[in-house]
UniProtKB/Swiss-Prot annotation:
GO cellular component, one term: plasma membrane
Keywords: Cell inner membrane, Cell membrane, Membrane, Protein transport, Transmembrane, Transmembrane helix, Transport
Subunit field text: Type II secretion system is composed of four main components: the outer membrane complex, the inner membrane complex, the cytoplasmic secretion ATPase and the periplasm-spanning pseudopilus. Forms homodimers. Interacts with XpsM/GspM. Interacts with XpsE/GspE and XpsF/GspF.
Periplasmic side of membrane: 234-373
Similarity annotation: Belongs to the GSP L family.
InterPro entries tied to this protein: ATPase_NBD (IPR043129), Extracell_DNA_Util/SecSys_Comp (IPR052534), PilN (IPR007813)
Cytoplasmic side: 1-214
Superkingdom field: Bacteria
PANTHER family from the UniProt entry: DNA UTILIZATION PROTEIN HOFN
Protein name according to UniProt: Type II secretion system protein L
Membrane topology: Single-pass membrane protein
Protein purpose: Inner membrane component of the type II secretion system required for the energy-dependent secretion of extracellular factors such as proteases and toxins from the periplasm. Plays a role in the complex assembly and recruits XpsM resulting in a stable complex in the inner membrane. Provides thus a link between the energy-providing XpsE protein in the cytoplasm and the rest of the T2SS machinery.
GO biological process, one term: protein transport
């Protein structure tokens, strides 16, 4: 039995007590869909090559599951190299097992708990002293599970062959001792029991048909893992780049909004400042009203200007020399004064004047408003 099928068998015994028949039926049903050659190449077949001495001839049998077909009959003696040279290509990789006659073996039935399936060889070694007249060092042995009872116990069988029956002249020839993957025993009808009496250390390890598949699967898994990791890393890198670009775009818009907000704030503050400045200065209407009350008759203005908190009056008056005195004491301005000299206009009997004054601050404006009220 191959490693895969051994593993599946152990799982079937331990994981599903009482369902061994169903497990075997399910396996066989699945395998029936695959050609025999594929079953062997995938490591799912029980195919092996049996070698059995029959008088003066060596019978070569190919066992597949429970059936055996004669491959060749070679005159004895024959060397392993000669047999391998005669084998077809499809049979070269099959494990070779020597088949002993039923008379060489001693078989004893065993009833074991289900937990014993995991350590069947150790349990069988312990049972040798109890079930046979030999010790474990005097025999080659193996055990096989026959059935799983409804109560979970195992029906097993212990198979032992004295060492002299294998190592002696009537056993396996010395030339074949290092060329075998196992030693099996035939039952009363000549069918192999399916045991392997050869110790694991002496079994020939042929190339595992699944080794190449396992290697390819491992390489494929590594490649897929590397590709998945690279794709994940590239995806995360792309996501990071997109996030960085989005942050930069948002930062640019945020800076633009902040700049526009600052500009708007400055405009609002500037407008508020100018509004405040205008509120603290007398208006043109108020200045005109004040001038109309203070300027005497016969006075004409050619220019009226308010710039930077300074009032400038240019005009003609018959009483130009008294204008400064008349303008003094107003709550809307202070320190009125003539700029330059008076220029006489003899034809009209008036003098040209230029007067400047500083507009008053908010306190004076409030006083003027109160006086008007």
């Amino acid at each position: 039995m191959t490693a895969w099928r051994d593993t599946l068998g152990r799982i079937g015994v331990r994981a599903m007590p009482g369902a061994g028949g169903f497990w075997r039926w399910w396996q066989q049903s699945l395998l029936a869909w695959l050609p025999q050659r594929w079953q062997w190449q995938l490591g799912l077949s029980q195919s092996r090559l049996l070698l059995q001495l029959d008088g003066e001839a060596l019978q070569l049998l190919r066992q597949r599951d429970q059936t055996s077909d004669t491959v060749a009959s070679l005159p004895w003696p024959v060397q392993p190299q000669e047999v391998n040279a005669l084998l077809p290509t499809a049979l070269e990789g099959l494990p070779q097992h020597w088949l002993l006659p039923a008379s060489h073996a001693l078989r004893r039935p065993l009833r074991l708990p289900a937990a014993a399936a995991a350590r069947l060889q150790d349990v069988a070694r312990f049972e040798i002293d109890r079930q046979t007249p030999f010790t474990a060092d005097q025999v080659y042995f193996d055990a096989r599970v026959l059935d799983v009872r409804e109560d979970g116990q195992l029906d097993a069988e212990l198979v032992v062959v004295p060492r002299r029956m294998i190592d002696g002249p009537a056993g396996v020839p010395e030339a074949w001792s290092n060329a075998l993957s196992g030693i099996d025993v035939a039952d009363a009808r000549g069918a192999p029991l399916g045991v392997n009496l050869l110790p694991p250390a002496r079994r020939l390890r042929r190339s595992d048909p699944m080794q190449r598949w396992n290697l390819l699967l491992a390489v494929a898994a590594l490649v897929l893992l590397a590709v998945a990791g690279w794709l994940l890393l590239d995806n995360r890198r792309q996501a990071a780049d997109d996030l960085r670009a989005q942050v930069q775009a948002n930062a640019g818009r945020a800076r633009q909004v902040a700049a526009e907000r600052q500009q708007l704030l400055e405009l609002v503050e500037g407008a508020a400042f100018f509004q405040e400045q205008r509120a603290t200065r007398p208006t043109s209407v108020e200045i005109w009203d004040e001038l109309s009350r203070r300027l005497p008759s016969g006075t004409y203005l050619e220019k009226f200007s308010v710039e930077g908190g300074q009032l400038q009056l240019i005009g003609l008056s018959k009483e130009a020399s008294s204008l400064v005195r008349r303008l003094e004491g107003s709550p809307l301005w202070h320190t009125p004064s003539l700029t330059g000299v008076l220029q006489s206009d003899a034809g009209r009997n008036v003098d040209r004047f230029t007067i400047t004054a500083e507009l008053a601050g908010p306190d004076a404006k409030e006083a003027a408003d109160a006086a008007q009220r």
